[in-house]
Design a protein with these regions (language model features):
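CoA-thioester-processing core
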Residues: 1-34, 63, 67-68
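Terminal peptide-recognition signature
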Residues: 21, 45, 83, 122
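Helix-loop "lid/cap" segments that line or gate small-molecule binding pockets
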Residues: 33-34, 71, 86-90, 105-110
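Acidic, divalent-metal-coordinating active-site segment for phosphoryl/phosphodiester hydrolysis
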Residues: 38-44
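Structural motif
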Residues: 48-49, 125
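C-terminal long alpha-helix characteristic of the crotonase
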Residues: 51-100, 129-134
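Short, basic/aromatic-enriched C-terminal tail that caps enzymatic domains
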Residues: 118-134
């Protein structure tokens, strides 16, 4: 279960929740959750996009490890790092600035060994062996 209980305690939406929640679930849904301070279930959290998946407690660690394994074996570490940076940076930019920056990054990253390995792995239909983690 989840809640934004601040309203029931005479507190404001704390720790940036009023900034973050609308970006995750949309303005209307964020208003509902923040203004009512109601409890919502994991199923509703999934529907809202607040969480990506739901697992039984006994499965949580194994599923988390499987997800991490998928990331580190299929996605370039450089791409992960750069994309994560872009996601958070682009929250504060307009789309034109984001596109310009992505074009610059493409030029830079296309010169890296991980790019060459990614292309080779795709063509050869095999898992990549990222040079950046050797």
């Amino acid at each position: 279960k989840f809640t934004t209980a601040h309203g029931k305690l005479n507190l404001p939406a704390e720790y940036g929740l009023s900034w973050m929640l609308p970006k995750i679930v949309g303005l209307g849904r964020a208003n509902d959750l923040l203004l009512t301070s109601r409890v919502f279930t994991s199923d509703e959290a999934l529907t809202l996009g607040f969480v990506n998946q739901i697992f039984e407690p006994a499965e949580l660690v194994a599923q988390t490890v499987a997800y991490a394994h998928q990331l580190i074996t299929s996605v370039s570490p450089n791409s992960l790092r750069q994309t994560r940076w872009q996601i958070y940076k682009d929250l504060h930019r307009d789309v034109a600035s984001a596109v310009i920056e992505s074009e610059r990054l493409i030029e830079d990253m296309a010169m890296e060994e991980d790019f060459k390995e990614g292309i080779a792995a795709l063509v050869e239909k095999r898992p990549p062996d990222w040079p950046s983690i050797k």
